[in-house]
């Protein structure tokens, strides 16, 4: 339908005796150049503002800092004093029966269920990516830059992820395990972890 209309208007313009006025009309060209530019600017400005507002996380219950290294993750619970640990993959030779190969870690990230969690992600050496697909989270870890993301777990459980950026020879040995627990269990875990040394 659109092609037919364009062909009809083109034929009308070519057969008309006054076509020279339409073909050389600089005013028309100026209007159909400036008007779409103004419309695009009017669409872009609010869209950029909304894009930045979507990235803001209002009052999370917990802030977690994930730092990517070759080839493990370090975690800091910034709302707690001295609550940080390194998380390494458990080698296949030491893996308990029934656990997932290449996905289990020695220290899991524990978060409270039904609480907004902010994750600040960075790297200490090369590019990494903190990704837990079942939580809908993937954030690039870039040295010297802090990226943030957020998630809420709606049920208790264990969620598996991995580094999603090729970061070297042992890239596939950087699993991420997030354990979501009810708030009382999280509080007892954080108390126990902060009093003991890893």
From Swiss-Prot:
<dbReference type="GO" id="GO:0005507">
    <property type="term" value="F:copper ion binding"/>
</dbReference>
<feature type="binding site">
    <location>
        <position position="171"/>
    </location>
    <ligand>
        <name>Cu cation A2</name>
    </ligand>
</feature>
<feature type="binding site">
    <location>
        <position position="167"/>
    </location>
    <ligand>
        <name>Cu cation A1</name>
    </ligand>
</feature>
<feature type="binding site">
    <location>
        <position position="174"/>
    </location>
    <ligand>
        <name>Cu cation A1</name>
    </ligand>
</feature>
<feature type="transmembrane region" description="Helical; Name=II">
    <location>
        <begin position="27"/>
        <end position="54"/>
    </location>
</feature>
<feature type="binding site">
    <location>
        <position position="165"/>
    </location>
    <ligand>
        <name>Cu cation A2</name>
    </ligand>
</feature>
<dbReference type="GO" id="GO:0005743">
    <property type="term" value="C:mitochondrial inner membrane"/>
</dbReference>
<keyword id="KW-0186">Copper</keyword>
<feature type="binding site">
    <location>
        <position position="167"/>
    </location>
    <ligand>
        <name>Cu cation A2</name>
    </ligand>
</feature>
<dbReference type="Pfam" id="PF00116">
    <property type="entry name" value="COX2"/>
</dbReference>
<keyword id="KW-0460">Magnesium</keyword>
<dbReference type="Pfam" id="PF02790">
    <property type="entry name" value="COX2_TM"/>
</dbReference>
<dbReference type="InterPro" id="IPR034210">
    <property type="entry name" value="CcO_II_C"/>
</dbReference>
<dbReference type="InterPro" id="IPR045187">
    <property type="entry name" value="CcO_II"/>
</dbReference>
<dbReference type="InterPro" id="IPR011759">
    <property type="entry name" value="Cyt_c_oxidase_su2_TM_dom"/>
</dbReference>
<keyword id="KW-0249">Electron transport</keyword>
<dbReference type="GO" id="GO:0045277">
    <property type="term" value="C:respiratory chain complex IV"/>
</dbReference>
<feature type="binding site">
    <location>
        <position position="163"/>
    </location>
    <ligand>
        <name>Cu cation A2</name>
    </ligand>
</feature>
<feature type="transmembrane region" description="Helical; Name=I">
    <location>
        <begin position="1"/>
        <end position="13"/>
    </location>
</feature>
<keyword id="KW-0812">Transmembrane</keyword>
<keyword id="KW-0999">Mitochondrion inner membrane</keyword>
<dbReference type="InterPro" id="IPR002429">
    <property type="entry name" value="CcO_II-like_C"/>
</dbReference>
<keyword id="KW-0472">Membrane</keyword>
<dbReference type="InterPro" id="IPR008972">
    <property type="entry name" value="Cupredoxin"/>
</dbReference>
<feature type="binding site">
    <location>
        <position position="163"/>
    </location>
    <ligand>
        <name>Cu cation A1</name>
    </ligand>
</feature>
<keyword id="KW-0496">Mitochondrion</keyword>
<comment type="similarity">
    <text>Belongs to the cytochrome c oxidase subunit 2 family.</text>
</comment>
<keyword id="KW-0679">Respiratory chain</keyword>
<dbReference type="GO" id="GO:0004129">
    <property type="term" value="F:cytochrome-c oxidase activity"/>
</dbReference>
<keyword id="KW-1278">Translocase</keyword>
<feature type="topological domain" description="Mitochondrial matrix">
    <location>
        <begin position="14"/>
        <end position="26"/>
    </location>
</feature>
<comment type="function">
    <text>Component of the cytochrome c oxidase, the last enzyme in the mitochondrial electron transport chain which drives oxidative phosphorylation. The respiratory chain contains 3 multisubunit complexes succinate dehydrogenase (complex II, CII), ubiquinol-cytochrome c oxidoreductase (cytochrome b-c1 complex, complex III, CIII) and cytochrome c oxidase (complex IV, CIV), that cooperate to transfer electrons derived from NADH and succinate to molecular oxygen, creating an electrochemical gradient over the inner membrane that drives transmembrane transport and the ATP synthase.</text>
</comment>
<dbReference type="GO" id="GO:0042773">
    <property type="term" value="P:ATP synthesis coupled electron transport"/>
</dbReference>
<keyword id="KW-0813">Transport</keyword>
<dbReference type="InterPro" id="IPR014222">
    <property type="entry name" value="Cyt_c_oxidase_su2"/>
</dbReference>
<keyword id="KW-0479">Metal-binding</keyword>
<dbReference type="InterPro" id="IPR001505">
    <property type="entry name" value="Copper_CuA"/>
</dbReference>
<protein>
    <recommendedName>
        <fullName>Cytochrome c oxidase subunit 2</fullName>
        <ecNumber>7.1.1.9</ecNumber>
    </recommendedName>
</protein>
<feature type="binding site">
    <location>
        <position position="128"/>
    </location>
    <ligand>
        <name>Cu cation A1</name>
    </ligand>
</feature>
<dbReference type="InterPro" id="IPR036257">
    <property type="entry name" value="Cyt_c_oxidase_su2_TM_sf"/>
</dbReference>
<feature type="topological domain" description="Mitochondrial intermembrane">
    <location>
        <begin position="55"/>
        <end position="198"/>
    </location>
</feature>
<comment type="subunit">
    <text>Component of the cytochrome c oxidase (complex IV, CIV), a multisubunit enzyme composed of 14 subunits. The complex is composed of a catalytic core of 3 subunits MT-CO1, MT-CO2 and MT-CO3, encoded in the mitochondrial DNA, and 11 supernumerary subunits COX4I, COX5A, COX5B, COX6A, COX6B, COX6C, COX7A, COX7B, COX7C, COX8 and NDUFA4, which are encoded in the nuclear genome.</text>
</comment>
